[in-house]
């Protein structure tokens, strides 16, 4: 169990990236959803001991993460959003080097570990090729391989499927599901479908605060009967936003389709639709922004 209690972080320029964040994350896949700038990466860096929070506590089992960073690192696998690699170094040699840094000193044990990981992430056939020349999906799978060195009990993946094509994204997600059966995996993303497909529990982070949390199915069920859709002309969008709680827009066959949250039909031309996690996400962000705007005007 990863327990985060009243965690806040304020940067030197006064930006409050995290504001009183509390979460309890059990074994399995946990999705952390939020827009760019919500504070997701800051939270991931605090958990990964890459920066210290301004206040609050983080505990993983009996490890005080802030006071015992080395103890946490021994149990941690981390795939950041972006990571660099040495040029002209093969996947096998780079993974072997990273295993040394992780503390696997015996050559035979390292060889066995590296071979097993490359096969697990389906990179065995390209083990002699330089990682710098890998495609985006192959590079992310290598990133997961290095995160799995040492059999970590806590794995953090930050925006792992951004930029991947659908086939690579599906392959990568299947790998995450396999890994998440026995350890705590935190998936930080702004891609709603990843959380829908993978995670048994989730939270939404916006403006540095947790604005919703729970099981995806429970959050979706709570929205049922409250989402309505209608196709409109693009030029009508501002007028609808002024009169209704428009939570999402999308294009369908060249026309703008709006989703509106309301207890009853918001007007002619609207049809009730089955809510999805994307509706939950956008409705939550809309409510958070409206609340923030009201506070700013007060």
Briefly describe each language-model feature range.
Residues 171-259:
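ABC transporter nucleotide-binding domain
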Residues 96, 100-103, 108-126:
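Conserved ABC ATPase "signature" region
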Residues 155-159, 164:
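Catalytic Walker B motif of ABC-type/P-loop ATPase nucleotide-binding domains
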Residues 2, 17-18, 73:
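Conserved structural motif at the start of ABC-family nucleotide-binding domains
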Residues 48:
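Helix-to-loop junction immediately C-terminal to a conserved catalytic motif
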Residues 35-39:
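Walker A (P-loop) phosphate-binding loop of ABC-type ATPase nucleotide-binding domains
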């Amino acid at each position: 169990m990863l327990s985060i209690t009243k965690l806040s972080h304020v940067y030197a320029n006064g930006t409050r990236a995290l504001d009183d964040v509390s979460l309890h994350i059990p074994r399995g896949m946990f999705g952390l959803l939020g827009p760019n700038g919500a504070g997701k990466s800051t939270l991931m860096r605090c958990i990964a001991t890459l920066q210290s929070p301004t206040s609050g506590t983080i505990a993983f089992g009996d490890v005080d993460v802030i006071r015992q960073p080395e103890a946490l690192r021994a149990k941690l696998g981390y795939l950041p959003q972006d990571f660099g690699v040495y040029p002209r170094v093969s996947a096998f040699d780079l993974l072997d080097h990273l295993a040394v840094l992780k503390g696997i000193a015996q050559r035979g044990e390292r060889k066995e570990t590296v071979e097993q990981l490359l096969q697990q992430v389906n990179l065995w056939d390209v083990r002699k090729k330089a990682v710098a020349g890998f495609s985006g999906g192959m590079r992310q799978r290598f990133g997961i391989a290095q995160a799995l060195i040492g059999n970590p009990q806590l794995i953090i993946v930050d925006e792992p499927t951004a930029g991947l094509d659908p086939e690579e994204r599906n392959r990568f997600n299947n790998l995450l599901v396999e890994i998440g059966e026995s350890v705590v995996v935190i998936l930080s993303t702004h891609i709603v479908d990843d959380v829908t497909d993978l995670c048994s529990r989730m939270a939404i982070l916006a403006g540095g605060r947790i604005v919703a949390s729970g099981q995806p199915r429970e959050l979706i069920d709570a929205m049922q009967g409250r989402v309505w859709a209608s196709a409109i002309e693009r030029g009508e969008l501002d007028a609808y936003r002024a009169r209704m709680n428009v939570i999402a827009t999308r294009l369908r066959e060249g026309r703008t389709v709006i989703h509106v949250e309301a207890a009853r039909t918001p007007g002619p031309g609207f049809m009730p639709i089955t809510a999805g996690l994307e509706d939950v996400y956008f409705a939550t962000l809309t409510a958070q922004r409206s609340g923030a705007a009201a506070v700013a005007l007060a």
